[in-house]
Amino acid sequence: MSNFSIKIADLPVGISCTHPHLSDVCSEYLTDEAPLFSVGADEEHKEELRKFFLGSSQVFSDDFLESVAVQEKVCAAVLDYDAAVFHAALISFDGQGIAFAAPSGTGKTTHIKLWQRLYGDRVEIINGDKPLFTLRSGRFFASGMPWCGKENWGCNKTVPLKAICFIDRAEHNLISPLEDNREIMSRLFLQLVMPEEHRLMVKYLDFANKLINTVPFYLLRCNMELSAAQTAHDGIFGIE
């Protein structure tokens, strides 16, 4: 058994694990600070995950299942600290965070790569799959997490959250602000990393409601051409 601490955003977290894979995943986030809470993966949790993945064509190792189990426990525990994890691809553009959200296969990964091609070093991928959002003194911030999707795109940084942009595939590029909170919530609900415990579920939905009423939301209908990134940029930041 190995024990170590990591720091995600401003939250120090204690980790217990039996496989070196997890410490490798978390290596960029190690800290000496005393943890606010600690998590580990028990055998029952790993067995539940093993059954969940049973229909997959892949065979998942025990160290992978341990990493997923710990990730799920972290996602639940942070809700007690005005923080929540969402399914999204988070980039930093000139130091400001933009989160792109869409169902799997829509093209989030392709879209953030277009931003990199168009804007170069002005763009940094903070987390390609599950960033952490935090609410601090009335402002939302977005941070990297050790777990960042199959591409493993991410870094240990925190940026102010400028906007959240939903992506729909379309032939032509068009971005528009979303102002109907019911539509925003219906789209955002698909991106929630929902905990099982009712108490934490209530906290998650309250956090999401505050997010909707604080951060600008957009709907980007786009293709996979470079001009899609230009359209998104101009809609969020204005034409340079």
Residue ranges with predicted function:
Residues 111:
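Hydrophobic positions on the alpha1 helix immediately C-terminal to the Walker A/P-loop
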Residues 1-104, 114-124, 132-240:
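A noncatalytic interaction/capping subdomain that flanks phosphate/NTP-handling catalytic cores
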Residues 108:
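Conserved lysine of the Walker
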